């Protein structure tokens, strides 16, 4: 059996805010659908051949599940990623050195989901 990871679903009571946040991080919009009673969008690093993040509305009366975690490897360029995120106007803590010698940057999106850059 061969499996291929295709993406993540994020559900939000404020999907436009979450959508804008991930666009600011540099993810590309590969699909977008919006109307009065529906919000769905997909973002990816480059195109739909890579895993995507789908953002959906949480229907009224439903609870938001928290917290999702997303991980990116940076090829040793955590500081460059940090500077790019700060230049985009996103407030985040400085990267930290881990006990094993690596560097990590943790960013929290508007819904409390964490994004870890290694």
Segments from the language model and where they lie:
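Short, charged/polar, Gly/Pro-enriched secondary-structure boundary elements
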Residues: 48-53, 111-115
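Vicinal oxygen chelate
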Residues: 4-13, 32-33, 41-44, 60-118
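Core segments of cupin and vicinal oxygen chelate
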Residues: 2, 9-50
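Acetyl-CoA-dependent GNAT
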Residues: 55-60, 94, 98
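Absolute protein N-terminus
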Residues: 1-2, 118
């Amino acid at each position: 059996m061969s499996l291929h990871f295709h993406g993540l679903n994020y559900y939000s009571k404020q999907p436009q805010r979450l959508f804008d946040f991930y666009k600011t991080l540099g993810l590309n919009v590969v699909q977008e659908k919006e109307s009065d009673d529906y919000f769905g969008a997909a973002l990816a690093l480059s195109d739909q051949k890579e895993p995507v993040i789908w953002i959906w509305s949480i229907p009224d009366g439903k609870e938001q599940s928290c917290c999702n975690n997303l991980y990116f490897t940076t090829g040793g360029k955590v500081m460059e990623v940090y500077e790019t995120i700060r230049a985009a106007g996103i407030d985040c803590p400085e990267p930290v050195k881990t006990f094993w010698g690596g560097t990590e940057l943790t960013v929290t999106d508007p819904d409390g989901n964490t994004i870890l850059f290694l």
